[in-house]
């Protein structure tokens, strides 16, 4: 999969809760289609009256080569509590260390950083908040027409 053809150099989203913007999520791509780096950042803050009730900061850097995840470094801070996830390719497996321990998995495997279309065909993902291997069921739903600026296109819902 070539993220540069799909997204260019980056994709960015505003995050809303109850109609109010509470943060942002941005994913940046650098390198070449066969060997690239993906940096994802998300910052959320839910304010109640005069204080912040919930604060979430997330940063991940993933190295991809020839369509496979080679490494992943994630740091997360939720309400001041920090955690990390580290994954490295070793002997045709990915070794993952997270807050609940270590695990190993054979590729293909996808982290939950929400950009790689290949994840729709998988049933296990790397939870980038915990490092756990989570079982998932991704169901194909209907298509819908979306408009972005002056462009209109069909999008597949899952």
Stretches found by the model and what they are:
Residues 8, 73-157:
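Solvent-exposed helix/loop surface patches that form functional interfaces
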Residues 7-11, 15-90:
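N-terminal mature ectodomain segment of secretory-pathway/periplasmic proteins
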Residues 27, 157-158:
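Short hydrophobic alpha-helical segments that form membrane-spanning helices or hydrophobic packing faces
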Residues 1-3:
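N-terminal export leaders
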């Amino acid at each position: 999969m070539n993220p540069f053809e799909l997204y260019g150099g980056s994709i960015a989203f505003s995050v809303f809760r109850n109609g109010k913007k509470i943060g942002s999520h941005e994913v940046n791509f650098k390198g070449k289609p066969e060997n690239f780096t993906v940096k994802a950042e998300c910052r959320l803050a839910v304010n109640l009256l005069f204080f912040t009730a919930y604060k979430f900061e997330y940063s991940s850097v993933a190295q991809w080569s020839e369509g496979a995840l080679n490494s992943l470094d994630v740091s997360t801070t939720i309400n001041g509590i920090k955690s990390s996830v580290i994954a490295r390719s070793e002997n045709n497996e990915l070794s993952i260390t997270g807050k609940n321990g270590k695990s190993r998995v054979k590729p293909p495997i996808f982290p939950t950083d929400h950009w790689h279309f290949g994840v729709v065909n998988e049933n296990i993902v790397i939870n980038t908040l915990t490092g756990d291997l989570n079982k998932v069921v991704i169901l194909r739903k209907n298509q819908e027409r979306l408009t972005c600026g002056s462009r209109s296109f069909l999008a597949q819902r899952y």
